[in-house]
UniProtKB/Swiss-Prot annotation:
Interacts with HSPCA/HSP90. Interacts (phosphorylated on Tyr-223) with HSP90AA1; the interaction activates HSP90AA1 ATPase activity. Interacts with HSP90AB1. Interacts with GCH1. Interacts with SRPK1. Interacts with FLCN. Acts as a co-chaperone of HSP90AA1. Activates the ATPase activity of HSP90AA1 leading to increase in its chaperone activity. Competes with the inhibitory co-chaperone FNIP1 for binding to HSP90AA1, thereby providing a reciprocal regulatory mechanism for chaperoning of client proteins. Competes with the inhibitory co-chaperone TSC1 for binding to HSP90AA1, thereby providing a reciprocal regulatory mechanism for chaperoning of client proteins. This is Activator of 90 kDa heat shock protein ATPase homolog 1. It comes from the Eukaryota. Disulfide bonds: none annotated. Expressed in numerous tissues, including brain, heart, skeletal muscle and kidney and, at lower levels, liver and placenta. It is found in: Cytoplasm, Cytosol; Endoplasmic reticulum. It comes from Homo sapiens. There is a cross-link at residue 203 (Glycyl lysine isopeptide (Lys-Gly) (interchain with G-Cter in SUMO2)). Its main location: cytoplasm. The gene is AHSA1. Changing residue 223 to E: Phosphomimetic mutant. Increases the binding to HSP90AA1 resulting in TSC1 dissociation from HSP90AA1. CDD domains: SRPBCC_Aha1. Phosphorylation at Tyr-223 enhances binding to chaperone HSP90AA1.
Amino acid sequence: MAKWGEGDPRWIVEERADATNVNNWHWTERDASNWSTDKLKTLFLAVQVQNEEGKCEVTEVSKLDGEASINNRKGKLIFFYEWSVKLNWTGTSKSGVQYKGHVEIPNLSDENSVDEVEISVSLAKDEPDTNLVALMKEEGVKLLREAMGIYISTLKTEFTQGMILPTMNGESVDPVGQPALKTEERKAKPAPSKTQARPVGVKIPTCKITLKETFLTSPEELYRVFTTQELVQAFTHAPATLEADRGGKFHMVDGNVSGEFTDLVPEKHIVMKWRFKSWPEGHFATITLTFIDKNGETELCMEGRGIPAPEEERTRQGWQRYYFEGIKQTFGYGARLF
């Protein structure tokens, strides 16, 4: 997918008589099985919980069967992973008595969300009953799901590098349908005075846009996509920096998009000052993202206020394509593959 503010890499193929797979535009596949094995073992073996009854920890990954891969089809990433896992855990009571048990995870796959993955916790044969089983089933299972979520997120970021490359020579060009201003017009725009305070931006004609989109994931997961640096880099296919706190800054898409978070309520809404670098200096729009739970799906409502009037359609199309479709293509949150 082309970056916001750049040309589409697919067209480089037209310049070659041999139709070489430039920028991996045609079908490519990357095997992530070995990496996944190491990553899952590291994450699972870090699981440890404790309460007034004692503590429990995963001590061994006794079985890890499966595979993982990433496919790039015409610039769109498709993730596949399927694992059957067995773990051994040890519990130690406050009195120092040790207990051993097992965990089975038969269906860690791309067909199930993390919350849908089955996790079975049990004591080893001939072990006496202990309240530590309840600790492992409740708090231990929560940490196991967190570990699986981290695995899935990192799989979708670390292995995308190089599968969709930037435009030729790394040069940024204006999007189609957005002609650059003539030199005379750019010169005619006076630069804002550095001594003049601009708390609310420059005065220009503005407009409001609203968009709605449904994602096949939970509000919690979709919120993470917008507030986790690695996930933002994954769906934009470009470097990004962000601090997901009130007052935290963000820079995305090689600096083409920047702003500041002004309010964040996990799983509920995000409010931010947002600008595209071609906008008049000092001007920010206010973007509000509202996450609505729709029985396992999420309806995302985007409202943008203060959009420069000449940029209305470009901004609308940019959010639809580079945010919404980009997220669906990268993480599989769409009803269909784009």
